[in-house]
Amino acid sequence: MLAARLIILLSFYWLSASAIDPADPLFVDLPHGKIRGRDNGFYYSYESLPYAEPPVGELRFEAPQPYKQQWTDTFDATQPPVTCMQWNQFIFGDNKLAGVEDCLTVSIYKPKNTSQSSFPVVAHMHGGAFMFGEARQNGHENMMREGKLILVKISYRLGPLGFASTGDAGLSGNFGLKDQRLALLWIKQNIASFGGEPENIIVVGHSAGGASVHLQMLREDFAQVAKAGISFGGNAMDPWVIHQSARGRTFELGRIVGCGQASDSTELKNCLKSKPAGEIVSAVHSFLVFAYVPFAPFGPVVESPDAPEAFISQHPVDIIKSGKFAQVPWAVTYNTEDGGYNAAVLLEKQASSGRELIFDLNDHWFDWAPYLLFYRDSMTTIKDMDDYSRKLRQEYLGDRRFSVESYWDLQRLFTDILYKNATELALDLYRKHGKSPVYAFVYDNPANTGIGQFFSKRTDVHFGTVHGDEYFLIFENLARGPEMRSDEEIISRNFLNMINDFVVSGNGTMTFGNCVLQDNVGSNKFQLLSITKNGCENLQLESFP
């Protein structure tokens, strides 16, 4: 079905061949009518362009449908994209509900660069654990100032609205991934109208956005919509990506919002369609053990093979082993202290006691660890969970107690389990089963402020190079300070050039500064580029450090 839709959409490709009117580049003709963008000084923007019918009413919990409306008036593309409805971790306070249900849009940003008649294209998928986040959370001005690339930001369904699943055809799930896929088809079809090069599209994302890129690339037909991908700080091997107990969680969601009488998936879906979207999304708080833990109670699933328009029907590990995935260039990354994103909240001082939350782990480790580290659903018995929890604690802390002094070892545990080990696994699978180039880098250059300070609400702790420290040099984010150091400015420019050169490369080569990344496919050792404030260095490793 998805392949048929691709053929139908691409058959209309000629409709988007009309160029931007050189007399007024703010106006663009699309198959749905004319749009008007905005002049932002050194770039143009065309925001909030719908690529799908609103996923409301009978279209809630269904695969997205291509946008059909024809505009009689000029469409106002000057309004920033709305937030897809979510229970947002970044909102402090009890009520974390934000956004709207009708949110499936793309937003396009084009630099003013008269020396280029056309531009390679970066399709961007935001992060947020598949639960929260939005197209606006990452800036675009760094990329626009470089003046070499068109950027397209994709909005997609999140949380239970995007990923509730009963594991069968009745409520199959992965609606957020299917949104992303339809958006990529829209970009392929229409980007030429904005001066973009449809033959030179790369997909990038961070965290859940990086995992989304990887999941999109696990479809064999990915090469029909893009030529390469980069997964920053997240990939499909991460333990928080594929959910194994979605069915029970989705029926529990139904019970919470008043659909407990549903006897099967179809009844449950129909009942959930009748409930207010805000009520469904607000139910997320019932799945949290403490704070925002687990940070991804809903997410991608392996769908039943008989599900309508199934996105994936095998586990990513099995897909890669089968060789039936898109053989196109891919890069995957991690940071040396990625786990600070998840662990930093444990250093927040509690208002009631003035004591850090990390001390509570001494009494609650066996209860909380399976949720913090995402093995609650993969263990069959409580004994298995307790044994694994005990093993991890002994391996990383020995006989020491959880405390501020032992925080760095706990953060190292989080980094390994939630990010680094999965990157090593992905590379190992690709070097054995891949055919196109696969690259990897590790970033070690702490930002002055970042996610660690944000979630701990502290400035007196050094967290190292945490989640996002590299990505926010490409796409600005308020979690890190607005200013870049001189070394970060150089690194930012090298990252932007890396992306540009990767997308236009005819043979999939990748460079960073004066370093050429080495291909992992067919290699006996891991080929890993190390990036620090002092430059870059190619490493050949038996295992990750």
Swiss-Prot record:
GO CC annotation: extracellular region
Positions annotated with a glycan in the UniProt record: 113, 421, 507
Pfam families assigned to the protein according to its UniProt record, in alphabetical order: COesterase
Record's keyword terms, sorted: Disulfide bond, Glycoprotein, Hydrolase, Secreted, Serine esterase, Signal
Xref: PROSITE patterns: CARBOXYLESTERASE_B_1, CARBOXYLESTERASE_B_2
Localization in the cell: Secreted
UniProt EC number: 3.1.1.1
Signal peptide as annotated in the record: 1-19
Keyword Disulfide bond set for record: yes
Catalytic activity: a carboxylic ester + H2O = an alcohol + a carboxylate + H(+)
Main subcellular location of this protein, as a coarse class: secreted
Cysteines joined through disulfide linkages: 84-103, 259-271, 515-536
Gene Ontology MF, one: carboxylesterase activity
Active site as annotated: 207 (acyl-ester intermediate), 467 (charge relay system)
Family, as annotated: Belongs to the type-B carboxylesterase/lipase family.
Protein name: Esterase-5C
Phylogenetic classification of the source organism: Eukaryota, Metazoa, Ecdysozoa, Arthropoda, Hexapoda
Gene: Est-5C
